């Protein structure tokens, strides 16, 4: 599974986060998606103040799963048929090189993100949809 609306950035590259499903799990369950979301948030918390932030987490497996993180509360939200463009990104994640975190939002997503000291928050908009 991959996190499609949040990228980590260093001076030289963008890093997309992935969550590996155990090999014996060919059918994805809600538990697996929940584990992936918790993993992604555990990485994101290194760069932003979670208790002061509101943002969306969009996980892609065979479909998109969208969650709203609101100052400690995680809630699933309805998919609004937005797509998220593919970014050129490396999968090599090294937290020592990260300087910023980039959120992709849509017209339906309002966010408020507080970065930790030394990190930059970037936001871009992508309103592409499939019908």
From Swiss-Prot:
Compartments, record wording: Virion
Up-regulation conditions: Expressed in the late phase of the viral replicative cycle.
One matching Pfam family: Chordopox_E11
GO cellular component: virion component
Keywords for the protein's UniProt record, in alphabetical order: Late protein, Virion
Top-level division of the source organism's lineage: Viruses
Principal location: virion
Coiled-coil blocks: none
Stated family: Belongs to the chordopoxvirinae E11 family.
Name of this chain's protein: Protein E11 homolog
Natural source organism: Fowlpox virus (strain NVSL)
């Amino acid at each position: 599974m991959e996190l499609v609306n949040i990228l980590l950035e260093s001076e030289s590259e963008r890093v997309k986060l992935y969550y590996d499903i155990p090999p014996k799990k060919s059918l994805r369950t809600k538990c697996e998606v929940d584990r992936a979301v918790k993993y992604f948030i555990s990485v994101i918390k290194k760069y932003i103040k979670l208790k002061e932030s509101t943002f969306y987490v969009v996980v892609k497996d065979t479909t998109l799963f969208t969650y709203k993180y609101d100052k400690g509360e995680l809630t699933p939200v309805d998919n609004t048929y937005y797509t998220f463009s593919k970014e050129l990104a490396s999968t090599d994640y090294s937290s020592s090189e990260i300087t910023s975190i980039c959120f992709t939002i849509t017209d339906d997503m309002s966010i408020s993100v507080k970065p930790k000291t030394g990190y930059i928050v970037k936001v871009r908009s992508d309103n592409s949809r499939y019908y």
